[in-house]
Amino acid sequence: MQWALAVLLAFLSPASQKSSNLEGRTKSVIRQTGSSAEITCDLAEGSNGYIHWYLHQEGKAPQRLQYYDSYNSKVVLESGVSPGKYYTYASTRNNLRLILRNLIENDFGVYYCATWDG
């Protein structure tokens, strides 16, 4: 049986010493299980450093999935996160995208991006 999966996308304000503004669009999407979804994180001009992706599910603490090291153009996964589940890439200098692959019911939640330097 195919279940419809709702993935709610949102953005977390940056929170650290030397923060950059994120310009996020909050939206929700519904995708079929087994399909993919894409989340966009728009960064303010001149943003650099580390861009973090989080998942917050009801009743649980937010979980960091991965971060993108813009200095070295590489993605670092959190321990326990499946390497094939998420794909992150910089589509432009001020735009980072996260692709969620092979969606399952447990992927439901609020996805956030946040950035800071140092």
From Swiss-Prot:
Coiled coil: none
Highest taxon listed in the record's lineage: Eukaryota
Any Pfam family: V-set
Keywords: Adaptive immunity, Cell membrane, Disulfide bond, Immunity, Immunoglobulin domain, Innate immunity, Membrane, Receptor, Signal, T cell receptor
Leader sequence segment: 1-17
Domain Ig-like as annotated: residue spans: 18-118
Disulfide links within the chain: C41-C113
GO CC term (a single one): external side of plasma membrane
Alphabetized PROSITE patterns for the sequence: IG_LIKE
Primary role: V region of the variable domain of T cell receptor (TR) gamma chain that participates in the antigen recognition. Gamma-delta TRs recognize a variety of self and foreign non-peptide antigens frequently expressed at the epithelial boundaries between the host and external environment, including endogenous lipids presented by MH-like protein CD1D and phosphoantigens presented by butyrophilin-like molecule BTN3A1. Upon antigen recognition induces rapid, innate-like immune responses involved in pathogen clearance and tissue repair.
Assembly description: Gamma-delta TR is a heterodimer composed of a gamma and delta chain; disulfide-linked. The gamma-delta TR is associated with the transmembrane signaling CD3 coreceptor proteins following the stoichiometry: a single gamma-delta TR heterodimer associates with one CD3D-CD3E heterodimer, one CD3G-CD3E heterodimer and one CD247 homodimer forming a stable octameric structure. Upon activation, gamma-delta TR complex associates with FCER1G to initiate intracellular signaling.
UniProt protein name: T cell receptor gamma variable 2
Taxonomic classification: Eukaryota, Metazoa, Chordata, Craniata, Vertebrata
